[in-house]
Amino acid sequence: MRIDGALMGRGLHCEFGFEPVNLNTGNFYMDQSDATMNELNGEFSITRSYNSKGTDQHSMFGRGWSFNYDQSLSQMEDGSLLYMRGDGSYLIFDKNEDGSYTAPDGYVYDLKAVSYKDTDHDYIGWELTDADQSVWSFDKYGILRYVTDVNGFKTVLDYDDDYNLSKITTPSGKTFGVKQDKFGHIKELSLPDGGKVSYKYDEQGNLISVTDPNGTTKEYKYDDDSRMTSWKDENGNTVVKNTYDKEGRVVEQTDAEKGTATFKYGKSSTTTTDNEGNKTVYHYDDQYRTTSIEYPDGTTCEKTYNAENQLASETTAAGTKTYTYDTFGNVATETREDGKTASYTYNEQNKLTSATGYNGATVTYSYDGNGNMVTSTKPDGTAITYTYDDKHRMVSQTDGRGVTTTYSYDGPNMTGYVDGNGAAWGFTYDAMNRAVTMTDPLGNVTSNSYDANGNLTSKTAADGGVTAYTLDGVGNITASTDALGNTTTYTYDKMYNMTSGTDPKGNQISYVYDKNYQQVKATDAKGNTITYKYDSMGRVIEESNKDFGTKLYEYDKAGNLKKYTDGNGNATVSKFDSLGQVLQSKDAVGNITKYEYDALGNETKITYGDGSSHSKEYDNCGRLAKETDELGAVTTYTYDAADNLVSKSDDSGRTWTYTYDNTGNRLSETNPEGGTTTYTYDKAGNLVSSTDEEGRTDTYAYDKAGNLTTSKDALGYTVSMKYDLNGNLVSSTDENGNTSTMTYDGNGNMTSVSDAKGNITAMKYDSTDNLEQTVDALKGKTTYEYDSQGNSTKMTDALGNAYSYVYDKEGNNTSIILPTGDKVLMEYDAIGQLVKCTDAQGLVITYQYDGAGNLIHSSDNGGNSMDYTYDGAGNVLTQTDELGRTATYKYDQYGRLLKLTEADGSITSYEYDVMDRITAVTDAEGHKTTFTYDKVGNQLSMTEEEEA
């Protein structure tokens, strides 16, 4: 009995699936929320729960239903207490000899008797403290009166003289009114904004309909035992039909699209068959705890539990993860398959006080007496501090640099904040605490509108542009209309999958799904299709299209993509570690790339097919601290307390430094020469000026929507721009006053450009928004054609000259047909590298590559050839022609060319400044040419010296 009660609702250690069913017990369990809003203690909701195995319970919402504030305590004959929870489950607390109570194993509750005064009399009630330190207060009759969270925020339940619930008052004072019928059923819920939810029941006390504030209705049907047999959504579609066996377990579910899943129960197992026929077997012990799962692909998941009824280990194809817990049931350690362990500590309020990652780095947290977090300290010792008002709302946050952001509130709603730069943002809300307006520091206002159910129906931008949405009964967007009146429409199947979308020009894309609602076909406006196939685990195994052919995907037992075969039949094979990190990838020509990682999964080294490698190191906060490139050059990085990059240094001693304002906008960049570029911003964070190393300043201005409207350079030359309400650039005036104007179609494609002289270029697009035609007043008409992948297959210029293009399955251009009819042919290797090119005159050039993709040999049918060698960074070291003549190249560790030795022995050498600019070139005859630059990098002089 005790086990059965605990298994209602979200049964501990049970599996759930389909619409949904507790796969360990066969219980049909469903949650539906009738109202939600932001509150001082988080999200407040009125949520109903249904249990098909709980129809003997007759609650405020009828048989089998419960809701999150319909909780109670009942004293049993032996003194134990039965706790009815809001999800329909119940737990029994044993009473000890000292009068205390003990919660069932695996549940973190503290239940104690308390005395209270009511109408001048002393009574004994109870307080139940949960894992979040929220206290549920019950009166002498076991009726729930208050819920007080860890910060003291109280939700109050009021009852009439007959103990019928009459209202619920949230911590901020919002009231949800409750009306009950003569049977004690809730018949109406009144919302703070005046909206109403109404409920109807049949003669047996079953809830048969719920009508939301929009006036749309859900409907429910039951069998003679009050087990729900079906329910309809607000669109009138029957979302699910349930069939039960004699023991009240769901044995079949049929959804709105006629997909059918079945459930077969054994002595200690359940076998499910999904809509596509895939079978999964769930095994459980005598407490209905899942012990193993056999998946359709033959892999398994095994679970074990400790003596306190907590999950102790979980073993999948990827390996085993184990858990330990503290005395209050909090996870204390997690140990991975690779032996690495993460650990956690908590305070007496079960608040996390430290988290030590798999790399050994620790983040710590501290709290005030009310449980508010007052500091969080990163592994490097940097701390963020927080302060709170008397309602436990965070009123300031100070980062590691000492920069403070402050916040103001009205009840639970943040009405404004002032950032570290002193810029103020403001917000307003409706009666349901939904954000209605946002005002930026410049005074620009954006706003939202909602329907009675709280669905967003329109957004108004700061420039007045309105985007509007139309929704169906369940909240799917069926149409969106932009600020210029262009409308896109959408359709859905009965299970809420999008089946089509039609753009403002009438072009339609469509989608088809299998019985498990996996997309199996997508068709664009031209009728081009992509089809998909899936394995029994729901992973894509095949993707097909007439132009790219068929792509294949294979997975290892852990679900990692181990083999990918492209449309040309070329395969890439990968290997993974127990954490799912790729260790090695072998491409279709045999090149192998290897990867290494640190304990947090950051990539620490890549070794390429030619043996070169690039490595990275990270600090204990997970930030890139050092990298060594293929030539051994080392770059180090440092950060400020807000994680902004403040310096970058290489091993030659060069350093770049950066500064930031209090909100993270970059204020300056200083290069190794000492040259500094500075930036300024408006209060909204838009860049308004940049001053280069020479002191030259460019300025910028923006419209209310944040679009750049003017750009003025250091010489005073100004470019101005205007935009439509969709943010499309509609005119641009250059520094000479010449204005170009642009127009657009409903999809946002530019349809015309008119220059200052009145010359117009018109553009036309096909149904998939590819440029189809340009008409230039001076150059005439050019047309374009495309394949299903958007590759250009034909271009005909204004003179009628047509160029045709052919591609292989991977989009490599294999031939070009010239207007003369001549062809240029290209061939590629298995990884898309060009290996052969034949031009219209019959010249054939072949190419070969090394493991890093560098060209190492090219030769033509005229006897010409060239061979190349490279360093690890891909710089050419030698170049040898068909006669054996070799040119050699020498570089420094930063990849800068120092010396070029020609085949005849002549040498050209190069010198550089600290900014990698060439400062001198000495040719083979000893002539030296020097160069100077300004601070920005513009060349100031070139001096040719006499022979040294």
What do these predicted ranges mean?
Residues I46, S52-A948:
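Extended charged/polar low-complexity repeat regions
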